[in-house]
Design a protein with these regions (language model features):
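Zn-dependent metallopeptidase/amidohydrolase metal-coordination segment
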Residues: 240-278
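Short, Lys/Arg-enriched N-terminal segments with co-localized hydrophobic residues
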Residues: 9-30
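Generic non-transmembrane alpha-helical segments
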Residues: 42, 46, 192, 196-206, ...
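Active-site/ligand-binding-proximal alpha/beta "capping" segment
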Residues: 201-236
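Non-catalytic positions within long, well-ordered alpha-helices that form the structural scaffold/packing
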Residues: 130-131, 231, 250
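Metabolite-binding pocket within alpha/beta catalytic cores that recognizes anionic/polar moieties
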Residues: 31-185
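His/Asp/Glu-rich mid-to-C-terminal helical/loop segments that flank catalytic regions of hydrolases
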Residues: 267-301
Length: 301
């Protein structure tokens, strides 16, 4: 006959390992790491050379990938466990090749929290890039301008971010293979790369400014009241991406350069109704300047 104490012990372990919480805490994290390495191995099977820089392209900014020399195109759907882009303007391809003398892995389309993915899936590509040994990340986005001098068409180098309205992508058991439990976020956007970006911009005569990017979960655009509140807190731009990726890249000790393209004034700062078509059109109109800038940055890195 089984003693009550043994039954109690069995029930304790059942609760830990069999229910959803126990699965996510003790089992899911190991599966996630396996998925990262499976995705890495597949990409390495398609492109065997070392990669210098990973680039994440935001809404309407996909044409930058079109200037890659000798491109190897990999559909996201073919990469094991990779999410799939669902947003217009995000093609859903990883393109590996050469720009400006550097070997790059360029994400033509990214993933957002508002698409229904959890933060681990949203940031999985960054984990895969780290597992590939990539040390440098350029992350771009289309954003709303909050600061008075940030009008549509302006390119902005991200100096810092506000992120407290989102669940941290580092939440849950720590991925010790990638970084420590508690990571310093003082210099998320690497100061040396920010300085380099300004020097590169001068060389190609592209006007750039610097600002603080504020993350909103979306998919709805921000309200005028939210914009007023976050402007008071120091936000210069607002958007629905970039920050989760930057946090995970920083956790993995990658060098990070964030580039925002202002595609509209934020809510309440103009008479125009906000819509995604406007974002795409503004991004497309700035394509030539952004491509020129990023190519020069890559040459100078």
């Amino acid at each position: 006959m089984v003693s009550p104490s043994l039954l109690g012990l069995f029930y304790h372990f059942y609760k830990i390992f069999a229910n959803d919480i126990g699965y996510n805490r003790y089992g899911g994290i190991f599966m996630y790491i396996d998925e990262i390495y499976a995705a890495r191995d597949y990409i390495q099977s398609r492109y065997k050379n070392p990669i210098d820089v990973a680039i994440v392209l935001g809404s309407g900014l996909g044409p930058l990938a079109d200037v890659i020399n000798e491109p190897v195109e990999i559909d996201y759907k073919d990469i094991p466990y990779f999410p799939v882009s669902t947003v217009p303007g995000h093609a859903g391809k990883l393109i590996v090749g050469e720009i400006g003398g550097k070997t790059v892995a360029c994400m033509k389309g990214r993933f957002h929290f508002y698409e229904g993915y959890d933060m681990q899936k949203v940031t999985m590509p960054i984990r895969v890039f780290s597992a590939l040994g990539i040390k440098n990340l350029i992350v771009t986005n289309a954003c709303g301008g909050v600061r008075d001098d940030l009008n549509p068409g302006q390119i902005v180098i991200i100096s810092d971010h506000l992120s407290f309205m989102m669940p941290s992508p580092l939440r849950g058991p720590n991925l010790d293979d990638f970084g420590p439990r508690f990571k310093d976020m003082t210099d998320v956007y690497t100061s040396a790369l920010r300085s380099l970006a300004f020097e590169s911009a001068k060389k190609v005569n592209v006007d750039v400014k610097e600002g603080v990017y504020c993350f909103f979960k979306g998919p709805q655009f921000e309200t005028p009241a939210e914009i007023r509140a976050f402007k008071t807190l120091g936000a210069d731009m607002v958007g629905m991406s970039t920050v989760p990726e930057a946090i995970v890249a920083r956790h993995s000790d990658m060098n990070i350069l964030g580039i925002s393209l202002v595609t509209n004034k934020a809510a309440g700062l103009s008479n125009n109704e906000l819509n995604h078509i406007e974002v795409m059109e503004a991004a497309n109109s700035a394509e030539e300047r952004l491509v020129k800038l990023v190519k020069q940055i890559l040459e100078d890195m």
